[in-house]
């Protein structure tokens, strides 16, 4: 960046930019934020704005681009969304009063993890993560700068760190140590995170817990330091750090949550089709965020689960009160975000009016809960502090139609401040006086068209056309001459104008001062507002669970101290909602205390994966406090859920690999306990048949002998069903089918015992392969079954005359047949065969 012969203003820009080399610098110049040099070139392309230049006639004109200050937020959002940082340099003095260059300073650095004022309001958390390391120990801290939530935990390896970051869906990580090349590769490239470094620790420890382990303390303090360094202000809304252990909740890694579609549908990436979509009948932004958090972290504490269940039951038993409650919750705004705007000094009159509206709804919400007369609700009622003095202050002070801009006036209610009312009286009377002067001078002068107008340059003036200039009174003095008219003033008009201008200026200044005092007063209530937000959010989530329990016909699950699973006529709640209750076929899942493994066999696309997911989904719902889809449900409390459910029902995606299978299997057998739930679907399909079968059997045996976790193991290796005779805690189940008149119907019902057939050819028929091809495959299958051989039969000799195209006849005339002829189908897994069939079908 060339700096020779720069103007003082540009030199100021260069000096500031040196301090923030990794950020776009938005440099306030009047009504615009300007960008220069490379920032301008890059921003013009990213934001699709015009690229111009400063000093166009110079030998080396400086690239320049700009955005209006009043609409800058939408441009900042675009930059942040794409992973950039933005430094905001404001004018720190009035340019009209500045001597020399206007003083400018960076007042905030906005990063993907510190967005607090997006033009796209969202009910999701935006977590900023910090990690530090001490030997083999990792400290991971995270906070949401909007809600003020602040947490920390200790982890034993980098894989767990990455898993937690994925679970939080963080976009930015603050690093307190130097990453290895491999770690940087994972965080930056594989996880696409914005990486920021912070070596300093925050000195004010009032938000920290001195009992934390050293590495947890440093991760927390460096996160605080980074936040204060970028935000450059007091952050009174940040809550004291809360330490947690991942083992305090039902543990699920990112892959498990994705495969179960807990918070978003894995295929679409959208909310619809997820458990979150099913359970979300919340009415507030805080409630929606809390529900998402509950889904991410179901409980393992039976007492806390039952406490939630009991509130859901109360709401189910009080339909009309619950209906009133949901109506009242609709009047509640996002208190946490409003509190953060107060802390950041960005509150406008609209924010305060929303806060007052919310506070005015709280007594009604509290009264509804108290009216149910249930001791179960006492802890919720205690959190509903209406803060009446704050609601009274805002309602008395802020005008209902107040503008959003705090310098425009019209913010403060009449009657709130006596001095302000006097200024407003002068303005009102001044307007009347001007009307009286206009009428008096029109009558005295005889100029029928005489009128008083106003503009910023000339102030108030009499407008006289050229044809009437001869009638202008002697006490008029000329203020401006136009082509067809002239403007005049009088001493009386000037005096009134002076009084009005003084009153208007003093009124605006006083209103601003009053508003700032009110905003400061509101800031004293931030902690109480945050506690209220938590209480309302909890009420909102629990009423949402009650609504869903009623509309989706859910029942209250029971938890036993044993490991028995007994779910009668259970359903996959999300699939059922998508399909419709009339078409969904329920399944009973029963595993006695001495049964640890169900080995599931049956055709592809018959419902094995749905059956497995059904159990996991039911467990998650139960442990977050929700009711579950079944006629009855008795469950243990699981400490973790592990899944390897790949793309068995999503063949075209082709994302799973044998290595991923083995890594996820290893994760399960390394961390599962007897209190865990393991779901393995088609494990071993990504390698040769005997390799896959050997691995599948050894994994089953290991779980059976060394872990004892409740396990659903779906497999296409029918040979494994013989394990039931040697493993006393394993039972076979299968998906039932109905064969009638040569047609096969999948009943989607789980029944005891192993499957007797795989029905692979029938699945191929469903996939739409040609009838001649299927007929040939069926003939080969019959021949194999009769021979009892594991080798393919010899290919038929081609015939000069054939009535129909057979599987291998005349391959030279059909490229698909040629490809099929090359396949060693007897050393391929059913999954591999299905993938090939799908690809060939697409070529037809």
Swiss-Prot record:
SMART domains linked: MUTSac, MUTSd
GO annotation, cellular component aspect: cytosol
Swiss-Prot/TrEMBL GO biological process terms: mismatch repair
Pfam families referenced in this protein's UniProt entry, alphabetically: MutS_I, MutS_II, MutS_III, MutS_IV, MutS_V
UniProt entry tagged with the keyword Thylakoid: no
Residues reported to bind ATP: 602-609
InterPro entries documented for this protein: DNA_mismatch_repair_MutS, DNA_mismatch_repair_MutS-lik_N, DNA_mismatch_repair_MutS/MSH, DNA_mismatch_repair_MutS_C, DNA_mismatch_repair_MutS_clamp, DNA_mismatch_repair_MutS_core, DNA_mismatch_repair_MutS_N, DNA_mismatch_repair_MutS_sf
Keywords of the record: ATP-binding, DNA damage, DNA repair, DNA-binding, Nucleotide-binding
GO MF annotation terms: ATP binding; ATP-dependent DNA damage sensor activity; damaged DNA binding; mismatched DNA binding
Similarity-based family: Belongs to the DNA mismatch repair MutS family.
Function: This protein is involved in the repair of mismatches in DNA. It is possible that it carries out the mismatch recognition step. This protein has a weak ATPase activity.
Descriptive protein name: DNA mismatch repair protein MutS
Species, as recorded: Streptococcus pneumoniae (strain Taiwan19F-14)
